[in-house]
């Protein structure tokens, strides 16, 4: 469960390493985001020479959460960390690689490019 001021690891090679959540998109007064939700973030740590610079305001989609998500069959999927992938306005990732596993719920929310780039879909 991601909320305002939450820090997330960046799971792509866009140049950002850590982002801080500014706003959860999707309705007025919405407080929390889960896997597959789009958030507005600012870059807190970045690698030198990357596409994304420190202090830049970006949009990202949450791909892993510690809280996890409940599936229709009653099972839960949880991860060891909170992670996001920085995206463009057309929902495609800014980077060219995705690191670590992503949840199957991204496929239902039309983030097909992220799912296809991910090394593992759980």
Swiss-Prot record:
Pfam families (UniProt xref): Ribosomal_L14 (PF00238)
Q: Could you tell me which InterPro entries the record lists for this protein?
A: Ribosomal_uL14 (IPR000218), Ribosomal_uL14_bac-type (IPR005745), Ribosomal_uL14_CS (IPR019972), Ribosomal_uL14_sf (IPR036853)
Kindly list the GO CC terms recorded for this protein: cytosolic large ribosomal subunit
Q: What SMART domains does this protein's entry cite?
A: Ribosomal_L14
Alphabetized, the UniProt keywords read: Ribonucleoprotein, Ribosomal protein, RNA-binding, rRNA-binding
Instruction: Give one GO molecular function term.
Output: large ribosomal subunit rRNA binding
| CDD domains, alphabetized | Ribosomal_uL14
What PROSITE patterns does this protein map onto? RIBOSOMAL_L14
One biological process GO term for this chain?
A: translation
Q: Main role? A: Binds to 23S rRNA. Forms part of two intersubunit bridges in the 70S ribosome.
Q: How does it assemble?
A: Part of the 50S ribosomal subunit. Forms a cluster with proteins L3 and L19. In the 70S ribosome, L14 and L19 interact and together make contacts with the 16S rRNA in bridges B5 and B8.
Q: Which family does it belong to?
A: Belongs to the universal ribosomal protein uL14 family.
Q: Can you say what this protein is called?
A: Large ribosomal subunit protein uL14
Question: Top-down, what is the taxonomic lineage of the species of origin?
Answer: Bacteria, Bacillati, Bacillota, Bacilli, Bacillales
């Amino acid at each position: 469960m991601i909320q305002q001021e939450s820090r997330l690891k960046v799971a792509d090679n866009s140049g950002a390493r850590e982002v801080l959540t500014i706003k959860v998109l999707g309705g007025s007064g919405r407080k929390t985001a889960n896997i597959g939700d789009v958030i507005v973030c600012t870059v807190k740590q970045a690698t030198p020479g990357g596409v994304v610079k420190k202090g830049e305001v970006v949009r990202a989609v949450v791909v892993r959460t510690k809280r996890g998500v409940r599936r229709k069959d009653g099972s839960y999927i949880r991860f060891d960390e909170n992670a996001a992938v920085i995206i463009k306005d057309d929902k495609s990732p800014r980077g060219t690689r995705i690191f670590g596993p992503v949840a199957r719920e991204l496929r239902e929310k039309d983030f097909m490019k992220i799912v296809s780039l991910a090394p593992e879909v759980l």
